[in-house]
Design a protein with these regions (language model features):
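Structural detector of well-ordered beta-strand residues that form the stable sheet scaffold
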Residues: 76, 102-104, 159, 182, ...
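N-terminal export leaders
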Residues: 1-3
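Short, surface-exposed alpha-helical recognition segments that flank or form part
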Residues: 54-55, 78-81, 161, 229, ...
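H/E-rich (His + Asp/Glu) clusters that bind or coordinate divalent metals
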Residues: 7-21, 191-245
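Aromatic/hydrophobic pocket-lining residues that form the small-molecule binding cavity
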Residues: 60-63, 87, 112, 144, ...
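Mid-domain alpha/beta scaffold segments of enzyme catalytic cores
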Residues: 6-154
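Divalent metal-binding pocket/active-site signature
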Residues: 57, 108-110, 117-118, 122-206, ...
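N-terminal cationic-hydrophobic initiation segments that often serve targeting/anchoring roles
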Residues: 67, 94, 98, 174, ...
């Protein structure tokens, strides 16, 4: 059963894949998987009532086994939107990672200083602000700025997740953030557009003009239109994403 706790997996959501291949590339010593999630299990860490999707369960033990199989030494476990601001599943993974994981949380403005400190003690080092409309409900920007100012003294960073088409609207907010800023998935570029076109040029300017902004080069499987080798025998894989990376 892919999802426990009386939850039903959203139609079309992938099941857990039990047979991943081992990479031919040997990762360097200290390699970190900079973006991964744990989902539930639903019978232990229920999914949020306001979630936009229900995934298959993907526990911390499955994550750690995959980490070792792929050759990573550490993980950055990012709070999944299906858990809302209930960070228990993510924190549980950090506490059982034997010092090999850090976390990125989702919090609301009413979180206490004590609870922020407890997240820090567990290994959380950032918060995620999600602007992908199909995944989350709107949060007022003044609330997010308040959160950013509260986590700054802890030395945390802010992770931002957005669609490339929304960058012009979000520019002033992003550039006002007082912390280090980490962009998820290269700002989700539309890879059917020219890499030297105006949309990606704006993202490049966002990066170059703001030294506190960094980007994760991640998630080609969500960005690609052409698909990986397994889908169309393209060599190398993700040929439409590579120019943007």
């Amino acid at each position: 059963k892919p999802t426990s706790g009386g939850f039903t997996k959203t139609n079309g959501w992938l099941d857990w894949y039990t047979g991943p291949s081992k990479p031919t590339l040997k990762l360097p010593t200290g390699a970190v998987d900079a973006h991964c999630h744990v989902f539930g299990p639903g019978d232990t860490f229920p999914y949020a009532p306001q979630r936009k999707y229900t995934p298959c369960d993907a526990s911390k033990d499955q994550l750690f086994a995959l980490r070792d199989h792929l050759g990573f030494e550490r993980n950055v476990v990012v709070q999944a939107t299906c858990h809302g601001s209930d960070n228990r599943a993510m924190v549980d993974a950090l506490l059982h990672a034997n010092g090999k994981a850090r976390g990125v949380a989702t919090v609301t403005r009413d979180i206490s200083d004590a609870d922020l400190q407890a997240l820090h003690d567990a290994g959380v080092r950032g918060v995620r602000f999600n602007f992908v409309k199909r995944l989350v409900d709107f949060t007022p920007k003044e609330e997010l700025i308040e959160i950013a100012n509260r986590i700054k003294p802890l030395g945390w960073h802010v992770v931002i997740y957005f669609e490339a088409v929304d960058l012009p609207e979000l520019w002033d907010f992003f550039t006002a953030l007082p912390t280090t800023v980490v962009v998820d998935h290269m700002g989700r570029p539309d890879v059917t557009q020219p890499v030297d076109g105006p949309e990606f040029a704006l993202f490049e300017r966002f990066m170059t003009e703001h030294p506190n902004v960094w980007s994760k080069v991640t998630c080609p499987e969500r960005l690609s239109v052409s698909g990986p080798k397994a889908l169309n025998d393209a060599t190398p894989t993700y040929t439409d994403v590579v120019p943007f990376a």
